[in-house]
Amino acid sequence: MKPGDLAKKSKLTMLELRYLPFWLVPLTATSTYEGMLERISPAIIRKGTIQNEYDWLVLGRKAAEFPTREYRVPTEGKILFDFTKIEGQAKFLSSELDSDEAVIRAKDEVEENQRFLLKQEVDQVTQFDTSFTVEKPTYVHAPLWFVRYEYKGKSYSAIIDGSTGSMIRADIPQTDFKLI
């Protein structure tokens, strides 16, 4: 819960519009597994398949961090690229990944996600294999506002979707709870 005086007592220290490059990689992941379910007694050997379709978002920068799992590229605001419509003060970042590198990164991240989902089925994995069907990746730039503000002497940050105005991620100061 945010403090009640956050809007009044916070001070904006940075507001920057950046167009970040993303690769949207549509793919289907099919994972076959074998493992032990040990939550019940006696332990049971389980075999199965986990299949999911993804529109996996990959940030087109190598060293940058961005909460891609929390962000959904808004499809309704998608327009053909026109450099003349970029705001003058905005930072426009190009991709450091080509489409093949984006697909490799998407496959790695999706396989990790499939392994995470597998933990709901078995406790101990003895065999795991994933195959992919990948469609053509789409290269997009998304307008994002990066915000930094101060509240009671501490610095906080936020990221806002420039297309929809929705909050993607924000650091919120802790509220002081007092017992009466």
Q: Where in this protein do the model-derived segments appear?
A:
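Charged, low-complexity helical/coil segments in non-catalytic cytosolic or luminal regions
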Residues: 1-155, 172-180
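Hydrophobic "anchor" residues
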Residues: 155, 166-167
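A charge-rich, low-complexity, intrinsically flexible signal that marks solvent-exposed coils, linkers
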Residues: 160-162
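Short, surface-exposed beta-strand-loop junctions and turns on beta-sheet-rich folds
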Residues: 164-166, 175
